[in-house]
Amino acid sequence: MAQSFFELIKRIQALAEIGLHYSTSTYDTERYEEIQEISLKILNQLTDIPVEKIKPVIEENNGYKTPKVDIRAVVFNGEGKILLIQEKVDRCWALPGGWADVGYSPKMVAEKECFEEAGLKVKASHLLAVMDKTAQKMPPQFEYVYKLFIRCEPSGTNISTGSETLDVGWFGENEIPELSLPRNLKSHIHMMFEYDRGERNSVYLD
């Protein structure tokens, strides 16, 4: 129920932002701003995060609200083990990746994140999955997020930590450490192993 309520509030926020973007009436603008302020206060009560911290996130992309894109690199070492990085922020593990960057293609982001987080040069090859974070029942956050999982081929197997990672490693399917759930679920990792074994061929799409 909490996640459902959270998503409804985010939808209200998005509609208010779209209204502000297109409104030509002072009256309508004031009403959309009031709706925005009310939804911020509800988010504050739901999350216990102060309004002054929520507001900059909401206002970051004022205008027609669209989903943010999170890109994850899927790398195997040729021995059936997948590359994971340990995040400094929560000390849990995830596929290398992060937000899509303006000026970078999805392939470029996957390659860049692998090198920055795991010290590994890779060549992005093809898309494996496109997931809707809400549909996947992942922990809620302010942004509405799509996740792209991109298969990458490594130039080697030597890996090293980056500025945002505590550790990096290659893991078998039965060796998966505690995962950073806002970034990936265990079901996502198992799906990537299915692709590696050839048990899945078509792109997964939410």
Predicted segments, located by residue:
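Unchanged
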Residues: 100-124, 132-188, 204-205
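N-terminal strand-loop-strand
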Residues: 55-94, 122, 126
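Acidic, metal-coordinating catalytic segment for phosphate/diphosphate chemistry
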Residues: 29, 33-72
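Extended, positively charged loop/linker patches that create polyanion-binding surfaces
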Residues: 96-98
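Nudix hydrolase/Nudix homology domain
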Residues: 1-32, 38, 92, 163-206
